[in-house]
Swiss-Prot record:
(Microbial infection) Stimulates the activity of Human Immunodeficiency Virus 1/HIV-1 pre-integration complex. It is found in: Cytoplasm; Nucleus. The gene is RFPL3. InterPro entries: B30.2/SPRY, B30.2/SPRY_sf, Butyrophylin_SPRY, ConA-like_dom_sf, PRY, RDM_domain_RFPL, SPRY/PRY_RFPL, SPRY_dom. Expressed during neurogenesis in differentiating human embryonic stem cells and in the developing human neocortex. This is Ret finger protein-like 3. Keywords: Cytoplasm, Host-virus interaction, Metal-binding, Nucleus, Zinc, Zinc-finger. One of its GO terms (cellular component) is cytoplasm. PROSITE patterns: B302_SPRY, ZF_RING_2. GO terms for molecular function: ubiquitin protein ligase activity; zinc ion binding. SUPFAM superfamilies: Concanavalin A-like lectins/glucanases, RING/U-box.
Length: 317
């Protein structure tokens, strides 16, 4: 079995004011700009006493030594653009330091703006697992809603759409348009991958979860390291361990957002998600013996809200 490769709060209130779904992408863009401007590319935390390199990039003062080309040397290699700066030519960036201070003050408001809108659940999909795509080491429940990794191959039929090396599975239905929402219970699992992918992704051989290859996923490793499948990886910070993940796909706006479905907190949003071909739900549980054999379960429908009519695999687009 092969591990998938990764390339290197307040509760919801029905009476609260939530961001309209149509303006959510704009808020995400704003939050992303704030995060990019205030984050250190070395430690991924807020910039602390930011120092500007000769190339114009900025890092924390405490992270400067990690850029040394040689121990105790004066040359600093930028981790963003690979340009070399002289230690005696770096300067404090006071203006950016003040900006970061303001952004830290605004963080609670940004979190509230990006909180999950309960109306997203109107678009909940009656989803099942597509057994024809399942890797042979995956054990699937009879109702096609839960999956975990096993130690013994299931000797399923060798199909063109089946993942033969990477231990993962696709969900059904496929999506060609509209808005769609679903939740996955990850329980206490310490490793998992969830999201969407192009229907045409390569399923033979070891796969890499990257947006460039058609995977828009959030992954958990070692019980605490959460990341998005951007290139390079975007490491994510959450207030608490995720146990139920909400995924909202908006084909029209070309974005997919991830939430802590229990608290409503925003986790991450991919923008510019390709809508040129159908997308499929993607799931990958942990792998024993290093993994914990955690179960991923698709949560049942919570209401009978309307959804855009999905297209099942094999049906005409």
């Amino acid at each position: 079995m092969k591990r998938l490769s990764l390339v290197t709060t307040n509760r919801l209130s029905p009476q609260g004011n939530f961001l309209p779904l149509c303006t959510f992408p704009l808020a995400v863009d704003m939050a992303a700009l704030f995060q990019e401007a205030s984050s250190c590319p070395v430690c991924s935390d807020y910039l602390e006493k930011p120092m500007s390199l000769e190339c114009g990039c900025t890092v924390c003062l405490k992270c400067i030594n990690s850029l040394q080309k040689e121990p105790h040397g004066e040359d600093l290699l930028c981790c963003c653009c690979s340009m070399v700066s002289q230690r005696n030519k770096i300067r404090p960036n006071r203006q950016l330091e003040r900006l970061v201070s303001h952004i830290k003050e605004l963080e609670p408001k940004l979190k509230k703006i990006l909180q999950m809108n309960p109306r997203m659940r109107k678009f909940q999909v009656d989803m099942t697992l597509d057994a024809d795509t399942a890797n042979n080491f995956l054990l699937i429940s009879d109702d096609l809603r839960s999956v975990r990794s096993g130690l013994i191959t299931q000797n399923r039929q060798d199909l063109a759409e089946r993942f033969d090396v990477s231990v993962c599975i696709l969900g059904s239905p496929r999506f060609t348009c509209g808005r769609h929402y679903w939740e996955v219970d990850v329980g206490t699992s310490t490793e998992w991958d969830l999201g969407v992918c192009r229907e045409s992704v390569h399923c033979k051989g070891k796969i890499q979860l990257t947006t460039e290859l058609g995977f828009w996923t959030v992954s958990l490793r070692d019980g605490s390291r959460l990341s998005a499948s951007t290139v390079p990886l975007t490491f994510l910070l959450v207030d608490r361990k995720l146990q139920r993940v909400g995924i909202f796909l908006d084909m029209g706006m070309q974005n997919v957002s991830f939430f802590d479905a229990e608290s409503g907190s925003h986790v991450y949003t991919f923008r510019s998600v390709s809508a040129e071909e159908p997308l499929r739900p993607f799931l990958a549980p942990s792998i024993p013996p290093n993994g914990d054999q955690g179960v991923l379960s698709i949560c049942p429908l919570m209401n009978s809200g309307t959804t855009d009519a999905p297209v099942r695999p094999g049906e005409a687009k």
